[in-house]
Design a protein with these regions (language model features):
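Short amphipathic alpha-helical interaction elements and helix-loop-helix interfaces
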Residues: 31-39, 61, 78-79, 112-115, ...
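Charge-rich (especially acidic), low-complexity segments
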Residues: 1-14, 146-247
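Histidine-centered catalytic/metal-coordination loop motif
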Residues: 81-171
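Residue-level recognition of well-ordered secondary-structure positions
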Residues: 30, 73, 88, 107, ...
């Protein structure tokens, strides 16, 4: 009997955490659709699931990534915002803080533990007051100013330091990124996306695509459709285009 009571309590606790996560994500998603972060567009990977988002990132003007179109995916835990989401680039990105498989390494997505070896302060790590908006702002900052103290891609970090220390005379880092930017434009063309090339276009690209705000998200639509035991989306599925990017 005690065992049944304990299991029921655990289920109730899990449901409460998930309910809290759904409410937080629905609120954040609505906010980002109505007032996007400059240089980003967000969408749901599946219309009936708030726990997996797709992100389109436009390379900022006057940076190496200018004119680039980079796809990423964010996955949220059942106890969000108490635990951080993960973020993975689906487009190839040569950067000191992006692993070869696309996983993004950034302090704001790291759990709030004290780890002196990481070189990160506890205040730089995730906490429940952070939001997707603050994550996206951190990502655009990291693209321009990589953290080379503990790189995810050592080769990219070495190239970046050479490029930086030579005041741009060492072109290897820059040339790799330029090739990826050009390749990303081909992907944008396939998706029917116009890549912003000027500052004016860049700010315009982030604006909502509809003149009327979307109807309020019905939270009940999301409670029963997400299976936490489901396998993660395969690498093959993640690398393909989908309806969000083709809009």
């Amino acid at each position: 009997m005690k065992g049944d009571t304990g299991e029921a309590a655990d289920m109730s606790s899990d449901e409460a955490r998930r309910s809290s996560a759904v409410k937080a994500l629905a609120s954040e998603y609505k906010s980002l659709v109505e007032e996007p972060v400059e240089g980003f567009q967000v969408g749901l990977a599946q219309e009936d699931c708030l726990f997996e988002w797709q992100v389109a990132i436009f390379g900022p003007p006057e940076t190496l990534y200018q004119g680039g179109y980079f796809k990423a995916r964010m996955k949220f835990p059942q106890d969000y915002p108490y635990s951080p989401p993960t973020m993975k680039f689906l487009t190839k990105v040569w950067h000191p803080n992006v692993y070869e498989n696309g996983d993004l390494c950034i302090s704001i997505l790291h759990p709030p533990i004290d780890d002196p070896q990481s070189g990160e302060l506890p205040c730089e790590r995730w906490n429940p007051t952070q939001t997707v908006r603050t994550i996206l702002l951190s990502v655009i900052s990291l693209l321009n100013e990589p953290n080379t103290f503990s790189p995810a891609n050592v080769d990219a970090s070495v190239m970046y330091r050479r490029w930086k220390e030579s005041n741009g005379q060492d072109k290897e880092y820059e040339e790799i990124i330029r090739k990826q930017v050009l390749a990303s434009r081909d992907e944008a063309e396939k998706d029917g996306v116009k890549v912003p090339m000027t500052l004016e276009d860049y700010t315009r690209a982030s604006r909502p695509q509809k003149t009327e705000p979307d109807p309020s998200i019905e939270l009940n639509d999301f409670y029963d459709d997400f299976d936490p035991e489901e396998d993660d989306t395969s690498e093959q599925d993640e690398s393909t285009g989908d309806s969000f990017y083709s809009k």
